[in-house]
Amino acid sequence: MQVGVFIPIGNNGWLISETSPQYMPSFELNKEITQKAETYGFDFALSMIKLRGFGGKTQFWEHNLESFTLMAGLAAVTSKIKIFATVATLTIPPAIVARMASTIDSIAPGRFGVNLVTGWQKAEYSQMGLWPGEAHYTDRYNYLAEYTTVLKDLLETGVSDFKGKYFTMDDCRVSPHPKETKLICAGSSDEGLAFTAQYADYSFALGKGTNTPTAFASVNKRLEAAAEKTGRDVQSFILFMIIADETDEKAMAKWQSYRDGADQEALAWLTQQAAPNAKAGATTNTQQLAAPESAVNLNMGTLVGSYESIAKMLDEIAAVPGTAGVLLVFDDFLRGVEDFGTRIQPLMKSRT
C-alpha cells in the first residue's frame, strides 16, 4: 500500500480547534515535513488549494500558500518522493496548468502529478469575480470534463484543438510535454466517481468515522462499478488523520482535547458554505466535511490509538479492495511523520 502525506499548506493543518497545535504555513515547514517523509519512504506528498478560510477565533485556513509554486519548490529539494499539486479549475486555464506541469516535471522528472478540484466554497471564487453562478453546483463535472480533455491533450501530445462549451483551443501547443503526469480527482458523489473513472488515474476520498478503518469500503465499490463502465483501472487514495501516542488512552485524551476546543465560529462558517452543495446529494465530500459528528477535523477518517493500534488499522485499510494507498494528516506533522516512520510503519504488514 502506498502512503502519502497531505502537507499543511494552510494554517493549523486539518484541526479546527483552539486546543490543537497552532501554526502558520511556510515553505520551510513543508520542506521539513516532505523531506522527512521521503526519508521514511513515503510514496508521495500532496498539497491542497484553498483561497478563503473559515475565520473564527483560530482564523482557520485564512492563511494559505499556493499549491503549484509550493510543490515546485519541494520538487527541487527532494529526489524520490512523488509530488502532487492541486488546481482549482475555476482559476487557472488548463493550458497554463499543462505548462506549469511541464515545468515541474523538468525539475522532478516523472515525479509530478495534478489533483483536480471543481470548487464548492463560493466565497473562494466570488471574492475575485470568478464564481460562475449557482448552476456550477450541478454543471461542474461537465466543466471539469472539458477542462481535463484539454489538459490531457496537452500533457500527452502537446497539442489541443478541442472545441466545447467552456473551452476553445486553436492549435494550442505546450512543449516540452511530460511523458506521464498522473491525475487525481477528489469526489465521492456518483457523478464525481463517474468522472474519475473516465478521466483520472486515482480517486481521492475521505475515510469515515473514528477507528472504523474500513467504513469507506462502499466508496471503493462504487468506483469499481463506475470503472467497469469505462474499462479503466482506477483505484483510491483514502484520507485519514492519525493521532498516535504510546497508549490508546493517551492518544484518545489528545483527540478529546481537540474536540473540546472546537472553534465553533469557524465550524458555523463551514456549514454555511457547504449548504448550497447539498443539492448535489448526500454522497458528496462537502456533505461529509460539514457533518456535525466530527467537523472539528472535517469529518475525515480518524485513527486514534497507540502506535501498534494505528499500524493494525492501517493494515485493515490496505486489505480493502481497490485501495491504492492512504493520504495521511497528523495533529502535529513533524512529530507525526517521525512517529509514523519509526514507530508505526515498522509494525505494518502492508509496508514491509
From Swiss-Prot:
Binding positions for FMN per the UniProt entry: I49, K50, N115, E124, R140, Y141, S189
InterPro entries associated with the record: Luciferase-like_dom (IPR011251), Luciferase-like_sf (IPR036661), Pyrimidine_monooxygenase_RutA (IPR019914), SsuD_RutA_monooxygenase (IPR050172)
Reaction catalysis annotation: uracil + FMNH2 + NADH + O2 = (Z)-3-ureidoacrylate + FMN + NAD(+) + H2O + H(+); thymine + FMNH2 + NADH + O2 = (Z)-2-methylureidoacrylate + FMN + NAD(+) + H2O + H(+)
GO molecular function: alkanesulfonate monooxygenase activity; uracil oxygenase activity
Record's keyword terms, sorted: Flavoprotein, FMN, Monooxygenase, NADP, Oxidoreductase
Gene Ontology biological-process annotations: alkanesulfonate catabolic process; nitrogen utilization; uracil catabolic process
Listed CDD domains: Alkanesulfonate_monoxygenase
Function: The FMN-N(5)-oxide reacts spontaneously with NADH to produce FMN. Requires the flavin reductase RutF to regenerate FMN in vivo.
Protein name: Pyrimidine monooxygenase RutA
